[in-house]
Structure formats: C-alpha cells, structure tokens
Amino acid sequence: MNETPRVRKPASERRAEIMQAADAEFAANGLAGTRIEAIAARVGVSHPRIVQMFGSKRSLFMEVMHATFDRIEAVFAEAEPTLVGLGDAYRRLLRSERTVGLVMLQAYAAAADEAVREEARRRQLDLQESIARLTGADGLQVRTFFATGLVMTVSDLLELPEQRADAAWSAWILERAAPPDGD
C-alpha cells in the first residue's frame, strides 16, 4: 500500500490553521459547545496536538477572542478617526468577516467563566479607550457608540429586514453615536 507521506508544516503555519478552524467552531458553537476534536478534524491534526500548542480549550478560545479584538482594533486604526468612520469600518468588518460578530457574542455568552470574563472585560475597556483616543469622544459618546455597535452586530447577524432593506436605518444608528456638531 502506497500512502502519501504527510508533509510537516512549520509550527506557525499549523498554528494559523488551528486558529482559523477554532474561529469558525467557536463562532458557531461557543466555548461550551465546541469540541477540540472538531477543530482538530478541520485541520487534520490530533486533539493532543492542539492541547500541546494551546494548553486548553479555554486558552484557545481566549486566543480566538483576542484575535477578534485585534481585528477590530486594526480596522479602527485605519478608519477615519470619527465615531461615524469607526462605525462604518466596523460594519464593513462585520459583513466581510462574519465570525467577528459571532465570536464577540460568544465571548459575552461565556462570561460566566471568570477567566474569560476578565479577559473580555480588559479587552473591552482597552477598545473603549482606543475609541476615545482616536475620536476624542467623551465617556457617554463611547458608551453610546458601543451600544450602537452591539445593535449593529445583532442586527447584522440576525439579518433583520430593516437592516438589510433600509440603508438609512444604519446611517441613523451611526448618527446616534456621532458627537453633536460643534463639539
């Protein structure tokens, strides 16, 4: 029997593949519902290999969560430094990378786990500080922006009819997060 020998991939490449598979699995099933075996099967590695690389399912989930926050921070850093500019960039990210919104919601859903809650809280606060720094927004404006972002995330993921059919609705929501003229 002639079997094709498996080609060993560099650890960094394998790690990236596992992160991509974990992103999809955690987005779909959350921390509690995801099985490491499902991630391993997507990549063609063993369960022990994933544990060897990441330590635990929770650690892998937190790395995926951090990567999601990093993607949001990266699009904000490149966006027009206004609340509307950041909101537009976030909406484009949600639509181009569906797992972003799903992983964020799964992170909030996993907040009963103290370690996840602490990391999600820290990253959320860091993101709020970044928004204030980038835009000059005050605390109320940042909180309004986050509330608006959560509405956008849920609306986009649920494909609410008014979200899809009425672009003016999105513009109206983003306007609510914009600072008043003259500030």
Predicted stretch roles:
Residues 13-14, 45, 56:
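The short coil/loop that forms the "turn" connecting the two helices of the helix-turn-helix
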Residues 17-24, 28, 42, 52, ...:
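Alpha-helical structural segments
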Residues 48:
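Key DNA-contact positions within bacterial/archaeal DNA-binding proteins
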Residues 113-125, 131-183:
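Hydrophobic/aromatic-rich alpha-helical bundle segments in the mid-to-C-terminal region
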